[in-house]
Amino acid sequence: MPYYTKLGSLPSKRHIQFRRPDGGLYAEEVFGTEGFVGPTSTLYHINPPTQVMGWKPLYSTKVEYVERATMRMRHVKSMPMKPKGDPVTGRTVLFGNSDVEIGVCVPKEPMKYHFKNAAADECFFIHFGSGIVYTMFGALKFGPKDYIVIPKGTIYRMEFEKPAAGEPAPRFLLMESVNGSHILPPPRYMSKKTAQFLEHAPYCERDLRLPELPMTFDEKGKFEVRIKSRDQVHSYMYSYHPLDVVGWDGCYYPYCFNIDDFSPIVAKHHMPPPTHQTFEAHNFVICSFCPRPLDFHPQAIVVPYNHSNLDSDEVLYYVEGNYKARRGIEQGSLSLHPQGIPHGPHPGTVEASIGATHTNELAVMCDTFAPLFPTKAAIALDDLNYPRSWESGWTPEERSAAMNGSVPGGAASNRSAAKTGRKSAKSTAVSKKGSAAVSPRRSGGAVNTWS
């Protein structure tokens, strides 16, 4: 993790006697990575963490991918997903490969157990909902637009508050490093000598929210910890509460970071997506596209240029903002633009963007360095007309005809793209504070710049 910290009670040195009030020894646990040479924390438990009552395999977590040989643009609409399961069992993987799994969770039930992912780091982006993640390192309060990074091996329980009347059900995007690598700030943001965030980084230590008290639960009984490993979830039973740590220190722990605390980097000309990078792991990166001033050259084109990212697949999760520059895109949409074919602005959006001074977009992107494959769940939510949304509308005459449904890919033949696009622009274009988004216009307007 980014830097050293500590919480709770600790002895003066590592690996010395540290006694409980009853005279017994606290159980020290070195919780580390990369064979004792990677980020590590040292924890002190009331009970021996090795004391297990019983265990059994529960269910498989192996993901089945489909259409592995198909290369095309995809648009998955996640908002119709029905609440199911809890914050673990309710997760639905939509895209993935041997490096990362990307999905959405709309939980319906509370967790009645604790969970440990012993195979991967997890990064959640909270779209809707607030609550607390109770971890072995302490409690993390979270709310909308928080990233939550939970490193491999952390025991936790995620608890959502009941939404108030009229508020949307809890929902979060999830990215899991199934290749076993760690999700960390990009090295270029960090000092090589001190692990401190450098001055050019778009966020820093002050923006991270670390675990807080309560941390210690000194309880006896029957407690289940479900552990994900080897493509299985296993049930382990303990006679004591698994969150029994009285103190810890080190550089390996979970934390929260709110996307609104990301400070976008702006420039005279359009900047590439790595400018918005927030985290990275082996073979994938996570980026944050946030509201910001746009490029300020007098003749700037402020939307992305057409690009062929020949080594990456790109998934964008649309959080809020102005969706008019994307046909059919709405809140909660996930678009997949694969390596091998170029992608870029939709017809008419380049001209419409000229003169815009700012963008109110908010989106999370995951770029991978190996092809992504869809699951059956993604196929069931896929807009089959999305690849045709670039087909027409490149001239004023085509755009007018498309609105009348008289050209291929227009409103009639591309009903999903055009109809849904008009609906989403009206009903889901919301600004940061929930007000209607500003329409793109030639001078001083707002525009979305999603790539």
Predicted regions and their residues:
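Jelly-roll (double-stranded beta-helix
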Residues: 1-451
